[in-house]
Amino acid sequence: MADTRISFDLDWTPPGASAEKPRIEFVCAPELAGRIPSPERAIRFAPEWFKRLDREMGMQDAHGLPGLTVKACLPVTDALSLGFVIPLPFDVMLQVPEDRVNIAMGWAEDVPFAPLEQHHPGQIGAPAPPFEAAMPLKFINPWRIKVPAGYSVLLTQPFNRPDLPFTCFSGFVDCDRFATTINMPFLWTGPVGQH
């Protein structure tokens, strides 16, 4: 059985590349096809606060023009739509204690793999500042990312999302030469309690 592939055309071609339109492909194991959500363009995950926001503030700016919100700012909108989001494959539960270190994780018994794992705190230098009360975790990504020769992939959390309860460690991966899945390390920055 063949791998499941999700492909998107890329809009830019590096100098000297072939005239064929470059594509990014997300490939998962066949047994996961239909059991996990597919990667999608980032704009599909625009935050609710942004969707609710009016373009105009209902008042004039210093020049007598309509006062505009960040929704009228093309650089912000472009950043929200830049790239792709790989959704968490399964529902998870976190129990975050006051110490923010001994985090308990849970998910359904029938999932084919653990969607989250812990890193050793020493990998980020914890408990030294700024990680005095931190447990590094990682999102387990079931999708391999394929790009044409000469392309690399920036892995980061969605841009302009102060509402998210986690902060990812960003990384740049040469996916044109790296033929395996890439996990995403992060810190829980949300409140303590059950989530």
Predicted features and spans:
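Short strand-edge motifs at loop-to-beta-strand transitions and within beta-strands
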Residues: 182-186
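Non-catalytic terminal segments and appended small domains
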Residues: 1-178, 189-195
